[in-house]
């Protein structure tokens, strides 16, 4: 089945207000910028995003934040986005902070049909005990806090129960993809993309290099086409650098 659509706008056209999105990438590496830009242009709002971080100001998911399109986010590292911090502290954005490895496993588990799993990460902290601020009110008071989670002991070690994540849509960026949706990621751009691709009920992939079925060595496929519903060819995407260090 040919899953290629002509434009990013066409690919995201049915993402409605209030949808949940799993978005791949780490920092500015491997993020689906064309799909995010198309979402901004579509006017969709009240979104819930699941992503390692929310980009930086005006880039990646930071673009959706800039236009105030995100209602809630499940994230791990968010310290590089000033607008994110402003919206969170002003009570405009709900934030569920999750340990990075736990977030990756929650996405992977959701995609594999695993409803929940136990992990030692977060035991003895507000991650497990509850009380972590999720939303502030306009005056700076805490309006919503995280609930306490179930804990259980195995072989003398305490673990906390974490739930798998499934989202309405997933947006991912791949280096190479074929018309059947088989994807290959390149180097660090693989971060969170495979997990997000499996977690979405409808997964949309933007690919730098579009090839015909059979051209990708099956042994190098990172996300099989069974997980992917739409493919958009986005050649020569901008390669933004989050932090540049040069020798004096």
UniProtKB/Swiss-Prot annotation:
Keyword flag ATP-binding: no
Entry superkingdom: Bacteria
Keyword Lyase: no
Reaction catalysed by this enzyme: a 3-oxo acid + succinyl-CoA = a 3-oxoacyl-CoA + succinate
GO molecular function, one term: succinyl-CoA:3-oxo-acid CoA-transferase activity
Enzyme Commission code: 2.8.3.5
Enzyme class: transferase
Residues noted as binding CoA in the record, renumbered to the chain: 24-30
Assembly description: Heterodimer of a subunit A and a subunit B.
Similarity remark: Belongs to the 3-oxoacid CoA-transferase subunit A family.
Protein name (Swiss-Prot/TrEMBL): Probable succinyl-CoA:3-ketoacid coenzyme A transferase subunit A
Gene name of the encoded protein: scoA
